């Protein structure tokens, strides 16, 4: 069992009273809720997580609204100051989400996890009256989303809106060309357009009024994506064959210059609907060949075709890639791969492809091996190349995992041999790899109970046996946020590389580098968009709806100011965009 995913779920009613978790008394209030406890330390049983016994854990409480929805989520004591981070939800009579309040840190008096009225607290914390995302729906049984109003006083009255319609030949913006795929796989533009109403249309408009249409066919496949810039349309068409496979993508450039070679994405399939041909705009096509088990065994791009080369992939009986490389097989020979199952069998002795021990069941002409993989065991240690480095035997079962590999270094005849070792939770705890010029690199990793790395010890040994070590140490807070990274070289004093501090919403607030000599502060707006970076040598402010530029409410940066040093003259830039969001 993966201990990182063990979660305790408890359905609690009003009679359940108080529970203890994460050294806090959790009051489930007078409502029905679900208590979720994720352990951060080793524990003796599920019941121990609900007691104050020193076992650290992450505790969440979800309160239901009585109709299957969640009315409030509380992350107990998760903020840097140990406050509850609380967010609330409201639904309409049909069960659709109608309002979502921004998460707000709330200091609990005596107990944590109790249901709270947080609207006023959120308004005070953010300094905005508009702290709820609101959703408006179509008044029908379909309950289609019509408008989404975001948070922030600057966005009051502004929404991301949707309109639902269909294709209409009489209205230019809702007119769609009809492309077909011929029996021979060629693109054909039909003389007869789509019948009115045969395509489902959705018009989206962001907070700045930029409009985007999408049209879908009866199979719910996207047929046309249309972006508007005034009266100019930027159309991307998607063309499917009779089996529903995407065959052509025709971007806006193709509409002005209908050249498939320069502007189109082209895909072709075999009789089993496997992709066998792929061509990107302006590029030579790539070919893909599969074996009888539907696994990719050969591929070729334009550059390889000029040199009569194919990439090949050999698999074991479990479908895992064991050998990768290039070969000089003829096109006719490659095509016959689909008639068989290409397998790599591990043989005894230093035989097979690149002396790896793997023998392909399909003949390869002049194979050049780039990657060899071994799985499940460490029997490869005695094979050619590995035996020179004395790789240790694994002490924990690695069944199902990659245990060793050989990597060919381009431009030389050298190989890099490596092995990975796991703990009982299938995490890599030691990784060893040889070096082309001799010697070894070893990485040993220690993990927390939850699976976060606590330390990584790197040992570099040269060909003469001389070793150097460096250790990275990672520290986390009570909510598993990374707070410190330290580095130690050999036996020298440890150096604090970086120290992170976070605000009450979990956003990175300050970075301190090199034992705190250099510090950088970060600022955000109510939508969590980065608005400022402040350091001793450099500062920068990003403006969206304020500043000197034209206000942008959709997330584009309208202007930027910066300066280097405390007394430097501020400088800045203003940005403008077209309706496609492109910088102009």
Task: Tell where the protein language model's regions lie, with residue ranges.
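Bacterial Sec-dependent N-terminal signal peptides
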Residues: 1-26
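Beta-strand elements of repeat-based all-beta scaffolds
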Residues: 21-576, 582-584
């Amino acid at each position: 069992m993966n201990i990182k995913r063990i979660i305790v779920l408890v359905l609690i009613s009003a009679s359940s009273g108080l529970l203890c978790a994460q050294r806090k008394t959790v009051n489930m209030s007078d409502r029905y809720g679900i208590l979720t406890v994720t352990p951060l330390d080793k524990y003796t049983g599920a019941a121990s997580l609900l007691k104050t016994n020193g076992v650290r854990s992450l505790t969440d409480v979800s309160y239901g609204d009585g109709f299957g929805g969640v009315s409030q989520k509380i992350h107990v004591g998760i903020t840097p100051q140990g406050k509850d981070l609380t967010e609330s939800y409201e639904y309409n009579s049909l069960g659709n989400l109608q309002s979502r309040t921004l998460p707000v840190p709330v200091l609990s008096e005596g107990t944590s996890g109790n249901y709270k009225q947080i609207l006023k607290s959120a308004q005070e914390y953010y300094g905005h009256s508009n702290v709820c995302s609101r959703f408006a729906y179509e008044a029908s049984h379909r309950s289609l989303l019509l408008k989404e109003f975001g948070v922030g006083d600057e966005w009051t009255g502004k929404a991301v809106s949707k309109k639902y319609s269909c294709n209409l030949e009489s209205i230019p913006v809702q007119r769609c060309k009809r492309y077909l795929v011929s029996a021979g796989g060629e693109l054909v533009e039909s003389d007869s357009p789509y019948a009115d109403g045969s395509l489902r249309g959705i018009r989206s408009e962001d907070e700045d009024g930029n409009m985007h249409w999408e049209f879908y066919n009866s199979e719910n496949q996207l047929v046309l994506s249309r972006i508007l810039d005034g009266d100019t349309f930027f159309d991307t068409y998607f063309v499917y064959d009779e089996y529903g496979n995407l065959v052509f993508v025709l971007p806006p450039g193709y509409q002005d210059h209908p050249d498939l070679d320069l502007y189109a994405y082209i895909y072709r399939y075999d009789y089993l609907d496997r992709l066998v041909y792929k061509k990107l705009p302006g590029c030579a096509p790539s070919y893909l060949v599969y074996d009888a088990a539907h696994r990719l065994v050969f591929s070729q791009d334009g550059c390889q075709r000029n040199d009569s080369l194919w990439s090949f992939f050999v698999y074991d009986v479990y479908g895992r890639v064991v050998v990768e490389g290039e070969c000089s097989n003829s096109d006719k020979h490659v095509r016959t791969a689909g008639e068989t199952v290409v397998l790599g069998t591990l043989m005894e002795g230093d035989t097979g492809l690149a002396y790896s021990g793997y023998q392909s069941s399909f003949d390869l002409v002049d194979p050049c091996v780039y990657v060899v993989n071994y799985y499940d065991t460490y029997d490869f240690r005695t094979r050619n190349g590995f035996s020179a480095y004395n790789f240790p035997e694994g002490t924990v079962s690695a069944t199902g995992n990659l245990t060793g590999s050989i990597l060919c270094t381009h431009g030389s005849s050298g190989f890099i041999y490596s092995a990975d070792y796991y703990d009982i939770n299938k995490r890599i705890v030691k990784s060893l790899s040889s070096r082309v010029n001799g010697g070894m690199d070893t990485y040993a990793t220690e993990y927390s109970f939850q699976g976060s790395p606590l330390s990584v010890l790197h040992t570099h040994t040269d060909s003469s046996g001389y070793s150097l070590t460096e250790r990275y140490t990672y520290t986390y807070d009570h909510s598993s946020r990374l707070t410190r990274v330290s580095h130690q070289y050999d036996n020298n004093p440890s150096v604090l590389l970086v120290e992170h501090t976070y605000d009450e919403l979990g956003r990175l607030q300050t970075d301190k580098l090199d034992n705190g000599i250099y510090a950088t502060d970060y600022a955000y707006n109510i939508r969590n968009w980065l608005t400022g970076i402040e350091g001793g040598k450099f500062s920068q402010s990003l403006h969206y709806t304020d500043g000197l530029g034209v206000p942008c409410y959709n997330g584009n940066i309208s202007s930027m100011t910066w300066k280097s040093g405390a007394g430097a003259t501020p400088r800045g830039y203003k940005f403008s965009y077209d309706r496609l969001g492109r910088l102009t």
